């Protein structure tokens, strides 16, 4: 029995975040032996916070499991919460989806995308908005909902981006971006447009993909994170792909981009890789940096 957090995340060095899948912004510094951590995306917290967020379990459940790990209590399998059943998983997805409305210019979701320089006149059907959704951390917040589709084009789960009350930024919480529980097939993504032929781009995050689409004037889909991006496959009939990687200090985003590019190129596809010039930037950063230059021109 173990909590399940990978050991390479717990070495007091910058590396992958077990919560948000960032590749080099997490560090477990274990101050005063309390398991403290900090992540550029998720924020900071203590060891119990990390364990609860990683497992989705409550404080008493985690405390009980740690007691068992330390030998303070005998491990009884029936004391551990069983994994969510498929019926429960689908019910949870339907319940969240039922609360959503079309993402339009009158919603706080639009205000959020405008704040990121990527407001649209009309948003893709894969993006919707929930005015008030439970965030899994004791709060209720506005939320942008994204449908994640599998490599066969079938919907597999939902991705949630929780927003501030005014919609002008992500919510001030440890994990404002969350996938719904359950397995996600390799190659899944958020299709931010219908594929009608021609070149197609792929990026990590939703905002990153929308920004790359603005800058390069082509459709770009979102793979959610670097790990999912390198496993992505383009839709049938697509033989030209532009890969938009993040410029990570430890090269995680670049590595994922080039691994994907290599795999697709070996299959005979025409592939280009694009990385922002500035270290630490993704394509939304690049877009926001370019906007003042465009306005001054």
Residue ranges of model-derived segments:
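Compact soluble domain cores
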Residues: 105-122
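TOPRIM fold recognition
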Residues: 38-45, 197-201, 206-297
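N-terminal structured subdomain of primase-like DNA metabolism proteins
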Residues: 1-75, 120, 237-239, 265, ...
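Phosphate-handling DNA/RNA-contact segment within nucleic-acid enzymes
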Residues: 135-236
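Short, basic/aromatic recognition patches
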Residues: 119-139
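Conserved active-site segments centered on acidic
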Residues: 61-103, 155
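Alpha-helical elements of the RecA-like P-loop NTPase motor core of helicases
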Residues: 49, 111, 210
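Short gly/pro/ser/thr-enriched loop/turn and capping motifs at secondary-structure boundaries
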Residues: 60-62, 69, 109, 228-231, ...
